[in-house]
Amino acid sequence: MLHQYTMYIREFLLHRRIDREGGVVEKVSMSHEDYLEAIVMLGGSQTQPVRSVDIATKMGVSKASVSKAVTSLKNSGMLEQPYYGDITLTEDGYKYGCAILKRHEMLTRFLVEKVGLSEEVAEDEACQMEHAISDESFKKWLAYFERIGL
């Protein structure tokens, strides 16, 4: 199971720092990472379209907030949306969203199984941690998870 997470995390770390031409790019904002994660959760695949209203409901935000985030994520090449159509992730957007989701799931599992937090508290904490820890720290977390068999 850890190998599955490691694959997504490595892909995430690559996409987070390097563009197709090999240049360094800025990390997607924490808010936009949450949108990508939510779209992956709602769609389940790269090709499954997702409605803006469903994203708004899942995230507890307004449709206007979703529209603003979608515009920004379209401009960064993470998703596609025809004029007033459903939202579909690009390959890069899907990989990034999957990596964030897997990172979140792994941290949640650790907080529940090894730290003893309730599922609800662990979910909230993992959501904060997935954005806050550095890539270097997370690589060390991965190594630790491997050692303890998580």
Where are these regions (language model features)?
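C-terminal regulatory/oligomerization modules of transcriptional regulators
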Residues: 1-18, 124-150
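Short alpha-helical segments that sit at the start of domains
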Residues: 8-37
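N-terminal helix-turn-helix DNA-binding core of bacterial DNA-binding proteins
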Residues: 26-61
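Canonical helix-turn-helix DNA-binding module
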Residues: 52-83, 91
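Helix N-cap/coil-helix junction residues
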Residues: 61, 116-117, 150
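Basic, amphipathic "hinge/linker" alpha-helix immediately C-terminal to the N-terminal HTH DNA-binding motif
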Residues: 85-104
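Arg/Lys-rich, alpha-helical DNA-contact motif
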Residues: 101-129, 134-135
